[in-house]
Amino acid sequence: GGLIIEPYYNRVLDFGMEFYASEQGEIEYKGLSIFSTENRAYSGNLLANEAIKEDIVNQFVKQELLQLVQVNICSQLASAFKEKYVGNFGVDMMVVTTDDATTFKLHPCVELNLRTTMGHVALALSPTDFAPKKMMKIDYLDKYHLAINLVGDDLLDTNLVR
């Protein structure tokens, strides 16, 4: 057993960046994953094109910072993974706010998942540029259930922004 102690954050948005590590040691960025959690457990993903997801995150974090984080993940993990790991992986992140709710900050690495994540599944199911946004939800009632529903333009409808 073990004990993990983490600080409490005023979370505003959960999201991640999805990647693929090749046999040659190259890291390929696959896209953003904007997801929801319930009781600290994954519950669903926004299915939308990359531009829409970037617009959502850019409400809180500058695009330049997101690109810098993406480039740093690729460069740092390329050497770390070379000849050690091949496959999909995701880096979970979150936007947090200060106690007075005046400033947003990026937590760039909440968790590193060395596997195909639900974010990768969401990227595979994401619509084309002109299709409406959807929400992929997973519920558990004696067994897992997957539902995909249309969502409106109001982000509060998606339960993603707190």
Sequence positions of predicted segments:
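Rossmann-like dinucleotide-binding core of oxidoreductases
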Residues: I5-Y8, V12-L13, Y20-E23
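A long amphipathic alpha-helix within ATP-dependent nucleotide-binding catalytic cores
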Residues: G1-N10, Y29, A41-T103, K143-V161
